[in-house]
């Protein structure tokens, strides 16, 4: 199996802005809206830096979803299994950002933007596809070539 360039960050950025209070979660009905908004915000941010937009890929969304479900079940923000997720795509480059407890897509993106490693992942020029998922308060962004 082709080895992926592992650019997934191992640093975890928690709250740059005030997170929602414990117990408050992204409502299930709002999850699709949150994902659409976050996707648009990521692509707008990339465009401001002269980068191409990322297309939404169902297979990457499924990997992001599995990871967000796992983090929620374990109540632990992590990059556990990143190497396996990346290798399963057979892509040359994959990046991953995770987040927890951001009340809106805008505050989630802002948290990532203010973390150098997460920001680098958002602005990785080699990736072209992305998947996003939200399970309770756990967000996963997964992008590959």
Cite the ranges covered by each PLM segment.
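Surface-exposed patches in mature extracellular/periplasmic domains of secreted proteins
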Residues: 48-62, 75-85, 119-134
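Bacterial N-terminal signal peptides
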Residues: 5-15
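Short, surface-exposed glycine/acidic/tryptophan-bearing loops
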Residues: 61-108
């Amino acid at each position: 199996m082709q080895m992926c360039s592992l650019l997934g960050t191992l640093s975890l950025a928690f709250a740059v802005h005030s997170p929602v209070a414990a117990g408050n979660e992204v409502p299930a009905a709002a999850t699709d809206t949150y994902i659409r908004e976050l996707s648009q915000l990521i692509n707008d941010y990339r465009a401001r830096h002269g980068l191409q937009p990322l297309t939404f890929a169902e297979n990457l969304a499924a990997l992001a979803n599995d990871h967000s479900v796992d983090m929620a079940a374990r109540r632990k923000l992590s990059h556990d299994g990143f190497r396996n997720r990346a290798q399963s795509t057979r892509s040359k480059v994959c990046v991953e950002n995770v987040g927890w407890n951001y009340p809106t897509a805008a505050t989630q993106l802002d948290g990532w933007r203010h973390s150098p490693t997460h920001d680098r992942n958002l602005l990785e020029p080699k990736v072209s596809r992305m998947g996003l998922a939200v399970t309770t308060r756990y967000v996963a962004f997964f992008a590959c070539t």
